[in-house]
Amino acid sequence: MKREHRLRYIIKEGIQDTFFIWKDELKNVFKDSGVMIFFFLVPFVYPLLYAFIYNNEVVHNAKMVVVDQSDSYLSREYIRKVDATADVKVVAVCADMEEAKQMLDEKKAYGILYFPCEFSKNIHKGKQATVSLYCDMSALLFYKAFLLATTEVSLEIGKELRAQNNPSSTIEQEKITINPIPYESVALFNSQNGFASFLVPAILILVIQQTLILGIGMLGGTAREKNRFHSLVPISRHFNGTLRIVFGKSLTYILLYVVVCIWALAVVPKLFSLPQVGEPWTVMLFVLPYLFASIFLSMTLSGFMTSRESPMLVFVFTSVILLFISGVSWPKEAIPPFWKAIGYLFPSTPGIQGFIRINTAGATLNEVAHEYRTLWVQAGVYFITSCMIYRYQIMRSRKLIIKQYRYMKMQRMMHR
């Protein structure tokens, strides 16, 4: 009977302490302006900022200059057709390459289209003609616009020349001669081939993880600075158990970031008409372990923060690296095994891959089972590591308190 009563008391005390820690952590968040910036300002403003920057999706009227050494009807027709495309604007026809290079250096144009003097002659002789394209590769979207426009025009003029050189008796035969194998290009999931639809969903997921790491790390560093023994755990009877600390603190972050997730993953894509074909219920179930894994990872890393500035010095630069190794901006098959392994230490890697497949391509949880299981494994592993960190901090605080008590007792005895 006593044992049962004791167990009930321990459970009741644990629940009360958990909610005390939850309220205390909530106060710490709202009292710290730096943490408020990471928890609210950054996740609410950054998604809008990136979405506004890439809202045009594709580049239109990319500036190009032409060097036409051929000066023939065919070269002028080629230039006219390129200029007529939506993505490219021919701003000047230069006398030579030096003049064209100077315009590129002055950023008056970002590409050069060069026609050699034998361009028209080779075509009339039945030989292959060459058109050279030079691009400023500091802006890949300009390169994409120039390449697509010139390729389409080359194919179109090639069809016209085949029709002229091989006259057919009927219209149907002429169509077969011009285009023997007709094809239709269909852009799946990203119908505009836009940059925002491709990149912004990955950034939205990454922002959640990075702001949690920075915010929780700052809270941990602040707690150490304020603590007499430079410990992560305050000296209080309410902070006398590992699970109650981990559950209490994580409950605070979960409740705060539910709002952040709704804003970043549902409202922002809706505002900017980004692809959203996944089922909301599926998205919610997938984001849940991602949120758990990110929180417990952040709590684990906060144990190594010695000051409130430490997270900014250590983790801010990792955002670009994590975006690259997530497999979005660069195919994951081409990423070296070492960096691929590093990527899977962070929830952002499976989180980005799974979220894009669900939200943009309409995948189900079964189709992202690998990423989903990985996130739950990460959540479990980082929960254990965060418990170990806080257990170590509790034991360390106890030892330091006992050591301080013995020292003070010895000092008192010596004064007597």
Locate predicted features.
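Alpha-helical membrane-protein architecture signal
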Residues: I15, F19-K23, S197, H238-L251, ...
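Membrane-spanning alpha-helical segments of multipass transporters and channels
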Residues: L49-Y50, D71, A92, L255, ...
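Hydrophobic alpha-helical transmembrane segments of multi-pass membrane transport proteins
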Residues: V45-L48, V186-V268
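Extracytoplasmic/periplasmic domains immediately adjacent to an N-terminal transmembrane anchor
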Residues: M1-S197, Y392, R398-R416
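Loop-to-transmembrane-helix entry motif
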Residues: V29-M36, V207, G248-I254, V258, ...
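Helix-loop interface residues and adjacent transmembrane-helix termini in multi-pass membrane transporters
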Residues: F30, F239, F304-M305
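Hydrophobic core positions of alpha-helical segments in small-molecule transporters
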Residues: F38-F39, P201, F247-G248, P311-V314, ...
